[in-house]
């Protein structure tokens, strides 16, 4: 159970980081 919970937390954190990385780069390209 603990392993599945950790996996879910890691999965959500990775997705959030991916979205956060896409946002600044997209805005940076528009600004450039």
UniProtKB/Swiss-Prot annotation:
Q: Which GO MF terms are attached to this record?
A: serine-type endopeptidase inhibitor activity
**Cited Pfam families:** TED_complement
Is the Secreted keyword given for this protein?
Answer: yes
Its localization reads: Secreted
Keywords for this protein:
Bait region, Disulfide bond, Protease inhibitor, Secreted, Serine protease inhibitor, Thioester bond
Q: Which GO terms describe its cellular component?
A: extracellular space
InterPro entries, alphabetized: A2M/Complement_sys, Alpha-macroglobulin_TED, MacrogloblnA2_CS, Terpenoid_cyclase/PrenylTrfase
The UniProt record lists the keyword Disulfide bond? yes
Locate the cross-link: Isoglutamyl cysteine thioester (Cys-Gln): 27-30
SUPFAM superfamilies reported in the protein's UniProt record: Terpenoid cyclases/Protein prenyltransferases
For this protein, the record's PANTHER family field holds:
MACROGLOBULIN / COMPLEMENT, PREGNANCY ZONE PROTEIN-LIKE PROTEIN
Q: Which proteins does it associate with, and in what oligomeric form?
A: Homotetramer, which consists of two pairs of disulfide-linked chains.
Q: Which family does it belong to?
A: Belongs to the protease inhibitor I39 (alpha-2-macroglobulin) family.
Which purpose does this protein serve, as stated in its record?
Answer: Is able to inhibit all four classes of proteinases by a unique 'trapping' mechanism. This protein has a peptide stretch, called the 'bait region' which contains specific cleavage sites for different proteinases. When a proteinase cleaves the bait region, a conformational change is induced in the protein which traps the proteinase. The entrapped enzyme remains active against low molecular weight substrates (activity against high molecular weight substrates is greatly reduced).
Q: What name does this protein carry?
A: Ovostatin
**Native source species:** Anas platyrhynchos
């Amino acid at each position: 159970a603990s392993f599945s919970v950790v996996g879910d937390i890691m999965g959500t954190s990775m997705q959030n980081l991916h979205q956060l990385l896409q946002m600044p780069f997209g805005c940076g390209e528009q600004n450039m």
